[in-house]
């Protein structure tokens, strides 16, 4: 037979457990140790449960006294565990903050910074100059219909001007646009005069890749339609733009031919001792206006187009267009 258990013995055990639990919990250094103590004190096979199991050997009148004392101890232990866990977490966070803190007075190693590609900055500068002249930006699709790329611009199917540019044809009447001029037609279909737009974008031609040609390049188209516009307005606009971009360089206009403008001209600037073609321009052909339902007796306008790569190469002294597409950091870091 097991030895008899007295009320005093169980009460003494609970008092001793209280002291032990208080000491052990206060010395626990992390959450794992506290969890181990919780199981050892409050679990089904824990030390407090062992006292409650022995309580069954007491007379019925004494059992409630032990049960009450055990419940008080459980509450105390739970409170001590919660308080210690909070303190441990706070200490761990403080240690982590101290360990991961940054000394803002230490010399910086520097983080390499990227920057915008010269073609992007050139395009943005060109567009900004025309925005300053009162123009607004218009855009159109790169996969274009034959009608907008050719027919609506006074270039019918049998027109010899179609031989002037090799085109990437797609299925049906779709193609990769060969210039940004289709934006003119699309915009005028939706917006009656007066119109002043600048249209930047990529264009595609079946050119062999060399120092001055690429099958994919960038253009900016300029269009103004209003009452009373003439060639002097075109010339004044082009001169103001070129002066703002290149500075005080000599400029000349040469008679030329474009199917959708009449008269037409090419614009050269004197650069490093030679004349360099930079733009094509002209007065919008009356046939183009009539095709849009506009009266050429009332409205007139001018258009101009330029290659962004050419402007970028002139501005930065680049001798090979392929350098702009190779993603060579040794080259791009210069800008």
From Swiss-Prot:
Residue positions binding Mg(2+): 262
A GO cellular component annotation in the UniProt record: cytoplasm
Names of required cofactors: Mg(2+)
Keyword annotations: Aminoacyl-tRNA synthetase, ATP-binding, Cytoplasm, Ligase, Magnesium, Metal-binding, Nucleotide-binding, Protein biosynthesis
Cellular location(s): Cytoplasm
EC number: 6.1.1.20
PROSITE patterns membership: AA_TRNA_LIGASE_II (PS50862)
Reaction catalysed by this enzyme: tRNA(Phe) + L-phenylalanine + ATP = L-phenylalanyl-tRNA(Phe) + AMP + diphosphate + H(+)
A Pfam short name: Phe_tRNA-synt_N
GO BP terms: phenylalanyl-tRNA aminoacylation
Gene Ontology molecular function terms on file: ATP binding; magnesium ion binding; phenylalanine-tRNA ligase activity; tRNA binding
Cofactor binding note from Swiss-Prot or TrEMBL: Binds 2 magnesium ions per tetramer.
Top-level EC class as recorded in UniProt: ligase
Main location: cytoplasm
Superkingdom of source: Bacteria
InterPro entries: aa-tRNA-synth_II, aa-tRNA-synth_II/BPL/LPL, Phe-tRNA-synth_IIc_asu, Phe-tRNA_ligase_II_N, Phe_tRNA_ligase_alpha1_bac, Phenylalanyl-tRNA_Synthase, tRNA-bd_arm
Annotated family: Belongs to the class-II aminoacyl-tRNA synthetase family. Phe-tRNA synthetase alpha subunit type 1 subfamily.
Subunit structure: Tetramer of two alpha and two beta subunits.
Name of the protein described by the UniProt record: Phenylalanine--tRNA ligase alpha subunit
Organism: Parasynechococcus marenigrum (strain WH8102)
């Amino acid at each position: 037979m097991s030895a008899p258990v007295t009320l005093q013995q169980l009460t003494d055990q609970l008092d001793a457990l209280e002291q032990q639990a208080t000491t052990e919990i206060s010395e626990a250094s992390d959450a794992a140790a506290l969890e181990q103590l919780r199981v050892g004190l409050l679990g089904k096979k824990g030390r407090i449960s062992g006292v409650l199991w022995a309580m069954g050997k007491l007379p019925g009148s004494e059992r409630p006294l032990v049960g009450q004392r055990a419940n008080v101890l459980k509450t105390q232990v739970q409170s001590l565990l919660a308080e210690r866990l909070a303190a441990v977490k706070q200490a761990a966070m403080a240690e982590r903050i101290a360990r991961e803190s940054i000394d803002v007075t230490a010399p910086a190693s520097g983080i390499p910074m990227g920057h915008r590609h010269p073609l992007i900055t050139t395009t943005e500068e060109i567009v900004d100059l025309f925005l300053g002249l009162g123009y607004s930006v218009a855009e159109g699709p790169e996969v274009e219909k034959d009608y907008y790329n050719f027919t609506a611009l006074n270039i019918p199917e049998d027109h010899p001007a179609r031989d002037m540019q090799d085109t990437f044809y797609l299925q049906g009447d779709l193609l990769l646009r060969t210039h940004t001029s289709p934006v003119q037609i699309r915009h005028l279909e939706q917006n009656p005069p007066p119109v002043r737009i600048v249209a930047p974008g990529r264009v595609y031609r079946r050119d062999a890749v060399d120092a001055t040609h690429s099958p994919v390049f960038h253009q900016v188209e300029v269009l103004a339609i209003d009452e009373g516009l003439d060639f002097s307005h075109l010339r004044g606009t082009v001169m103001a733009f070129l002066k703002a971009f290149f500075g005080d360089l000599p400029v000349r206009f040469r008679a030329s031919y474009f199917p959708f403008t009449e008269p037409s001209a090419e614009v050269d600037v004197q650069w490093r001792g030679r004349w360099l073609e930079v733009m094509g321009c002209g007065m919008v052909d009356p046939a183009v206006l009539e095709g849009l339902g506009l009266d050429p007796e009332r409205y007139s306008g001018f258009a101009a187009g330029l290659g962004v790569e050419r402007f970028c190469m002139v501005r930065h002294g680049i001798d090979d267009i392929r350098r702009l597409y190779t993603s060579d950091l040794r080259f791009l870091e210069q800008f």
